[in-house]
């Protein structure tokens, strides 16, 4: 299908996972391959996915496939050994290191169980030493840094510290998601510091979403499409599959005034640059 040709989805959930998913990784890869999608990053909040990426690539060599590791509790937080292992999995499919997401202090303190434990990133307005050590490791290994579900203030601190360490590729993951909720000004600051900002279908397509396609388009207009990336965050068992998410997201961007050139930049060119494919 022409609308999918060349897209790279940097944020796709699929089974196996502890959370119910609409497709498994092979079903997702087949669906994307058949539609002409160029590549996918497999994202899991509980486990590293470099090994899955290896298996998917073996079955679907036409696809660019990468894995990620999220520094949540189940990984051990700022666990350098886990990240090193992730990069050593056969053929080097490990690409993105995410700061805590579901285990982030910022998300936990806004959730239903506010007394739950979390993986801290900062204290007293400063990044923790173990976080700075992790950034050193990411820089040394040439990996992509995602700011996870950190607070807006922490996100800016992470980007500044990453740039000081010459981390080349930085992703602000779903900044308009309810648990992060960056302002447009904060997103523009992140972009000006050299990060990419990710806009996911899930935040506008999930039941009860308070963010709209119009909100996305307005933010992208302020930030500039050159620093923005579109992705699905698809795979929730209670929502339509990834391809539907993409169809809706692309249509929503066009309906709100973004050009085909800008949409291609955000769904093809920018993700390729983030992943070192261009």
Question: Where is each model-derived feature located?
Answer:
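An N-terminally biased module of ancient metal coordination in phosphate/nucleic-acid-related enzymes
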Residues: 1-63
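Short acidic/histidine-rich active-site segments
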Residues: 225-242
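Mid-to-C-terminal alpha-helical segments outside catalytic/metal-binding sites
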Residues: 245-278
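Acidic (Asp/Glu)-rich catalytic clusters
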Residues: 1, 53-62, 85-93, 136-138, ...
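Extended substrate/RNA-proximal surfaces in nucleic-acid metabolism proteins
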Residues: 61-64, 72-173
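Active-site beta-loop-alpha junctions enriched in small/polar residues
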Residues: 13-15, 45, 68-74, 100-104, ...
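Hydrophobic faces of well-ordered beta-strands that scaffold small-molecule active sites
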Residues: 6-12, 40-42, 66-69, 95-99, ...
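Catalytic pocket-lining loop regions of alpha/beta-barrel enzymes
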Residues: 136, 141-212, 229
């Amino acid at each position: 299908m022409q609308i999918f040709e060349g897209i790279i989805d940097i944020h796709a959930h699929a089974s196996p996972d502890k959370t119910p998913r609409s497709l498994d990784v092979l079903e997702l890869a087949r669906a994307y391959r058949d539609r002409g999608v160029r590549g996918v990053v497999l994202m899991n909040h509980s486990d590293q996915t470099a090994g899955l990426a290896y298996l998917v690539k073996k079955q679907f060599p036409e696809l660019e496939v990468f894995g990620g590791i999220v520094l949540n509790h189940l990984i051990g937080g700022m666990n350098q050994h886990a990240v090193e292992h992730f990069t050593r999995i056969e053929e080097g499919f490990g690409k993105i290191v995410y700061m805590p997401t579901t285990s982030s202090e910022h998300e936990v303190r806004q959730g239903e169980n506010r007394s739950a434990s979390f993986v801290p990133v900062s204290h007293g307005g400063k990044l923790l030493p173990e976080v700075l050590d992790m950034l050193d490791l990411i820089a040394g290994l040439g990996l992509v840094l995602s700011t996870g579900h950190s607070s807006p203030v922490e996100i800016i601190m992470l980007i500044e510290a990453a740039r000081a360490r010459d981390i080349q590729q930085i992703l602000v993951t779903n900044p308009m998601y309810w648990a992060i909720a960056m302002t447009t000004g904060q997103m523009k600051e992140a972009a000006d510091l050299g990060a990419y900002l990710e806009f996911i279908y899930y935040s506008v397509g999930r039941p009860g979403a308070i963010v709209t396609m119009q909100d996305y388009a307005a933010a992208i207009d302020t930030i500039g499409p050159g620093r923005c990336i579109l992705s699905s965050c698809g795979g929730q068992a209670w929502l339509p599959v990834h391809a539907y998410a993409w169809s809706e997201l692309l249509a929503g961007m066009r309906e709100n005034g973004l050009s085909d050139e800008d949409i291609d930049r955000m769904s093809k060119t920018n993700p390729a640059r983030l992943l070192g494919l261009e």
